[in-house]
């Protein structure tokens, strides 16, 4: 009898960042590019003068080797989280050289001045205080998939819009407690630094972000509603970092629930109720052809 095929191994997904002054980001980029290609990684790493940020995936052994390389390269305070994906979550591997590892667009000093970190239990305690202003720093399409109970949604389309939102909506709240959160914690390093720079006193953020919270907090004790949007093929994850139920609209990028996929304006790869009126018939025809080629195996 033929030997049974071994079960496919899940991909290990590593989300990581650290703010750290880098003397030669271009040299680090070259090393990471060569290492990732040898290890057959997929995903994106961003390198800048201020540090490193990214999400990558590969075999457990490959991710362990990448992690060891980063530690040996001086990233000794790396914010690092692993989860699993049943299918390849990214199409290719990229290492980008940028001005910022997460783009706020205004100068802040997250290596010198950030808010108070809270672990998940302390975060739950803070959320129970009705006087606390809880702010979701993510983009609107991320918030749509899920958020913390009682959180304010700034309804921004880019993190670059956050400073202007603060000036417009938090002016006069400098004496209040402000608690902020994001997917993995990196945006809150900059958002809390921004608020402290503007004179706010009591500024807090969730250490490790939503992903760490969902990993550590049982659903029965959770103040999280919905799923968490992630920037890979899983689209969303839930408690225990299990893959979620959402599917991305490849026209507009919104995460869609089963109910939204049952809407008459949903067509896989072409449109959903959020973008149906935003594209022309010519564009929809092009999307339809792209989807046909994808299903035929001509696109990946």
Curated annotation (Swiss-Prot):
Pfam families in the record: Rhodanese (PF00581), UPF0176_N (PF17773)
Keywords from the UniProt entry: Oxidoreductase, tRNA processing
SMART domains recorded: RHOD (SM00450)
Entry-linked InterPro entries: Rhodanese-like_dom (IPR001763), Rhodanese-like_dom_sf (IPR036873), TrhO (IPR020936), TRHO_N (IPR040503)
EC number annotated for this UniProt entry: 1.14.-.-
A molecular function (GO) term: oxidoreductase activity, acting on paired donors, with incorporation or reduction of molecular oxygen
UniProt similarity note: Belongs to the TrhO family.
Protein name, UniProt field: tRNA uridine(34) hydroxylase
Encoding gene, per UniProt annotation: trhO
């Amino acid at each position: 009898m033929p030997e049974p095929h071994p079960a496919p191994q899940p991909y290990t997904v590593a989300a990581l960042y650290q703010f750290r002054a880098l003397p030669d980001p271009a040299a680090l980029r070259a090393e990471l590019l060569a290492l990732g290609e040898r290890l057959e990684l997929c995903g994106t790493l961003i390198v800048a003068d201020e540090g490193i940020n990214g999400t990558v995936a590969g075999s457990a052994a490959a991710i362990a080797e990448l992690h060891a390389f980063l530690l040996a390269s001086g990233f000794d305070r790396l914010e690092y989280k692993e989860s699993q994906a049943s299918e390849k979550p990214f199409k290719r591997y990229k290492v980008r050289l940028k001005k910022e590892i997460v783009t706020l667009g205004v100068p802040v000093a997250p290596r010198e001045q950030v808010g108070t970190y809270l672990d998940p239990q302390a975060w739950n305690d803070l959320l129970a205080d009705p006087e606390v202003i809880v702010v979701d720093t993510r983009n609107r399409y991320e918030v749509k998939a899920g958020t913390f109970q009682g959180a304010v949604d700034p309804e921004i389309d880019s993190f670059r819009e956050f400073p202007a939102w603060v000036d417009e909506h938090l002016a006069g709240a400098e004496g209040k407690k402000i608690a902020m959160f994001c997917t993995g914690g990196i945006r809150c390093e900059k958002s809390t630094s921004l608020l402290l720079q503007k004179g706010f006193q009591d500024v807090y953020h969730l250490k490790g972000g939503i992903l760490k919270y969902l990993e550590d907090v049982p659903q029965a004790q959770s103040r999280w509603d919905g799923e968490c949007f992630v920037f890979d093929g899983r689209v969303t994850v839930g408690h225990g970092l299990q893959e979620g139920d959402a599917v991305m609209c490849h026209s507009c990028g919104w995460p869609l629930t089963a109910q939204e996929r049952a809407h008459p304006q949903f067509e896989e790869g072409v449109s959903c109720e959020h973008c149906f009126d935003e594209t022309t018939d010519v564009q929809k025809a092009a999307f339809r052809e792209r989807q046909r080629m994808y299903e035929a195996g001509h696109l990946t």
